[in-house]
Amino acid sequence: MAREISSISRIGTSEPFELQVARGQISYHESVYKFGNNAQVADSVETIWQQGGLYSYLSAESVLKVSSSSANDTSAGTGARTVELFGLDGDYNEISETVTLNGQTAVNTTLSYLRINRMIVRSAGSGGANAGIIYAGTGTVTTGVPANIYATINGDGSNQTLMALWTVPAGYTGYLMQYDVSNGTTSNTPAVCKLLLVARPQGEVFQSKDVKSLTTGMHIENTLVVPLKFAEKTDIEARAVSSSNSVTFDISAAFEIIYIKNGDEL
């Protein structure tokens, strides 16, 4: 039988449990805040990430190619110079590495990834941000764009990926504490934007865990009294769809997860 990991908050300390987790004061507890944006959601279901469309996951551990649509994103350029990737290896263990960019020419990662959860610009030239769109992907790279795209950093000054998806690492259980969603549109045509919170346990298919319907300009903040529990290696993502083929929504979503080491992994 698996041992339960005890949280310090059970003895009534005055500092909030969530703050203690963020400060690294509770052993075997980690936190993650994932957020994304999709500015072109129409009447087909899309993942909330800047590339648009439904996200396609890597089916096997792979070396990724990191490149940019701009020649200025290079080691001595005015744009982004280095990026850090965060993901999971073929055994679903957390990994990360820093890559020095070479403009539109792809640079291979040293590590192999089964999941890419985040990518951040760590250093840049005088522009202070990436000049083009930075990609992490596989396949043939044409003018900086790989055939298969798994992460992007758009040239909007964010300096990191905006992708509302995450995978629970091996040996951990994830607890979704809260999620938020907001939207907007320039259309005057009445329409509803539907948010879908979905998850895929390993070896299964994506299943809806919550659904919210929003009209234009709405913001929903949903704090869960009882968190949603996700087993190791579960893919979690936020998706959206418009009720009208003539109304496109700009939608953002975020979720907070605390993930705890499984007792039998100690």
Where are these regions (language model features)?
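Beta-strand-centric surfaces of beta-sandwich/beta-rich domains
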Residues: A2-R115, R122-L266
